[in-house]
């Protein structure tokens, strides 16, 4: 009997393959980073072919490290950076343009055009999302409008669209030789095109965007057998049986299956998801309404989400662009060497402000600078920015739900940073809890795939795998917490109203 499940985690900065055992423990991993392409200010792209090649390679790495073969693997699960759009030729398998990444802001003029007459909430009742550069829909329209011949080829039925889950699945299951063109409900809910109530593509919205329905993948549940692997000999005939967008996957991996449970993932961006059960809840406080998960024919679970565009990528910017640090862990050392931020606040609105503001006219700002400030203060302010943004999202969740969260489960790469987690607890005023397995995104995809093939029997079995690793209790006085929040909110206002006709 196969004793393991493999998860493919196609993320913003890298592609990984992680093998899990029945207890949810990591057996082995493979990881490769891909190039971040910045052709112009506000533009962010990935090479989709590089992503697929890396995916094949990391599968081999993970299997060889554990000395396993395809016969040991019960199923493949896939999780992915959501909203990142790939358009490719179904006959050649070649992308017609680079993947346009979720952080990319080039489509603001398309957003403005579509908002005429109905505002940015024109489609929100159906899809749960405001018009924004963040989601896939405007990216597809941009490719059709700007790549020579793309619109004509799409109209002829020659082009396919997918977020990177669809791109990886299509290639994994055969590509041009019968690859399965599908997506799951969680990824579909991030396109601007799926009706949350019917879980189907909305033709009226597609017509408004000018996107042919023939390009779109078939919408499936998050946990069912979609097909089997054909293009990788290493996993040949292994069922591909689970797909979840990365933030929904992390929620699933945290075993937040029930109404009122939540998690916050600290990665390139920061994403808090609050499970609303089988009810579609429309936020009045700047949150997104999205699909949480759907297991086979079981009822759909929905969620509220607070999306923060920049978290770990702010640390990358300090390292790779400014050269202020040599490695990400160095930030914790620098931040710990000073008692406070020296009066400095960094608002990392590189792609505008996401939740709860949704201000596309905002841009990054560093405020409160004096000659006293050194790079240690900057490092501390960079970490604190993530915690402050999370506090604002949590306030919105509490306002929408009417039941304040009493603790916050966390995961993602940044949760290894003890200083950040302590400050997060301090600024939230509630305990912050890290699980033993922090690779919850990949684990969630593995769980979805394993459930579909009977590797795990039910959600109760998955819940028993979850275990607490560390807990941070708030230690900040309430008066100081309130003062810090007032200063943060003041700093946020300084980032707004920047983009106008003079800014290119």
Curated annotation (Swiss-Prot):
Q: Extract the GO molecular function terms from the UniProt entry.
A: ATP binding; glycerol kinase activity
In what way is its activity controlled?
Answer: Inhibited by fructose 1,6-bisphosphate (FBP).
Biochemical pathway: Polyol metabolism; glycerol degradation via glycerol kinase pathway; sn-glycerol 3-phosphate from glycerol: step 1/1
Keywords, A to Z? ATP-binding, Glycerol metabolism, Kinase, Nucleotide-binding, Transferase
List of residues binding glycerol: 82-83, 134, 246-247
Q: Which residues bind ADP?
A: 12, 16, 268, 312, 413, 417
Q: Where does sn-glycerol 3-phosphate bind?
A: 12, 82-83, 134, 246
Q: Which GO terms describe its cellular component?
A: cytosol
Instruction: Tell me the InterPro entries matching this sequence.
Output: ATPase_NBD (IPR043129), Carb_kinase_FGGY (IPR000577), Carb_kinase_FGGY_CS (IPR018483), FGGY_C (IPR018485), FGGY_N (IPR018484), Glycerol_kin (IPR005999)
Entry superkingdom: Bacteria
Provide the reaction this enzyme catalyses.
glycerol + ATP = sn-glycerol 3-phosphate + ADP + H(+)
Question: What is the designated name of this protein?
Answer: Glycerol kinase
């Amino acid at each position: 009997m196969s004793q393991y499940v493999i998860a493919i985690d196609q993320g913003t900065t890298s592609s990984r393959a992680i093998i899990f055992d029945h207890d949810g423990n990591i057996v082995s991993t493979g990881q490769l980073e891909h190039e971040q392409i910045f052709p112009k200010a506000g533009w962010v792209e990935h090479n989709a072919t590089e992503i697929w090649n890396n995916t094949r390679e990391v599968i081999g790495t993970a299997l060889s490290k554990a000395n396993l073969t395809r016969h040991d693997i019960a199923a493949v699960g896939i999780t992915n950076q959501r909203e990142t759009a790939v358009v490719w030729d179904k006959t050649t398998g070649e992308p017609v343009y680079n993947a346009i990444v979720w952080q990319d802001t080039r489509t603001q003029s398309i957003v403005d055009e579509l908002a005429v007459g109905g505002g940015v909430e024109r489609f929100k009742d159906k899809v749960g999302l405001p018009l924004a550069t963040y989601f896939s829909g405007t990216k597809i329209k941009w490719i059709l409008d700007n790549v020579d011949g793309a619109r004509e080829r799409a109209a002829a039925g020659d082009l396919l669209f997918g977020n990177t889950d669809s791109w990886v699945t299509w290639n994994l299951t055969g590509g041009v030789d019968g690859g399965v063109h599908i997506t799951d409900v969680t990824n579909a809910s991030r396109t601007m095109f799926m009706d949350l109530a019917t879980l189907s593509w909305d033709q009226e919205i597609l017509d408004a965007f000018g996107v042919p329905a023939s390009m779109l993948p078939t919408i499936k549940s998050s946990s069912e057998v979609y097909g089997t692997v054909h293009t990788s000999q290493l996993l040949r005939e292994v069922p591909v049986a689970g797909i979840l967008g990365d933030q929904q996957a992390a929620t699933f991996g945290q075993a937040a299956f029930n109404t009122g449970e939540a998690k916050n993932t600290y990665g390139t961006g920061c994403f808090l998801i609050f499970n609303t059960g089988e009810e579609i809840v429309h936020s009045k406080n700047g949150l997104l309404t999205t699909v949480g998960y759907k297991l086979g024919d079981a009822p759909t679970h929905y969620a509220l989400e607070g999306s923060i565009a920049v978290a770990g990528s702010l640390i990358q910017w300090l390292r790779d662009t400014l050269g202020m640090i040599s490695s990400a862990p160095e930030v914790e050392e620098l931040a710990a060497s000073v008692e406070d931020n020296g009066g400095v606040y960094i608002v990392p609105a590189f792609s505008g402000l996401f939740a709860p503001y949704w201000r596309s006219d905002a841009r990054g700002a560093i405020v409160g600078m004096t000659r006293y400030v050194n790079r240690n203060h900057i490092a501390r302010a960079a970490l604190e920015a993530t915690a402050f943004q999370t506090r604002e999202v949590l306030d919105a969740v509490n306002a929408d739900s009417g039941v304040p969260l009493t603790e916050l489960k966390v995961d993602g790469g940044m949760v290894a940073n003890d200083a950040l987690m302590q400050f997060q607890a301090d600024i939230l005023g509630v305990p912050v809890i890290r699980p033993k397995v922090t690779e919850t995104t990949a684990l969630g995809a593995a769980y979805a795939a394993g459930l579909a093939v009977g590797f795990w029997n039910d959600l109760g079995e998955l819940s028993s795998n979850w275990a607490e690793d560390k807990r941070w209790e708030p230690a900040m006085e309430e008066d100081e917490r309130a003062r810090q929040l007032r200063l943060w909110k003041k700093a946020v206002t300084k980032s707004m109203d920047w983009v106008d006709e003079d800014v290119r």
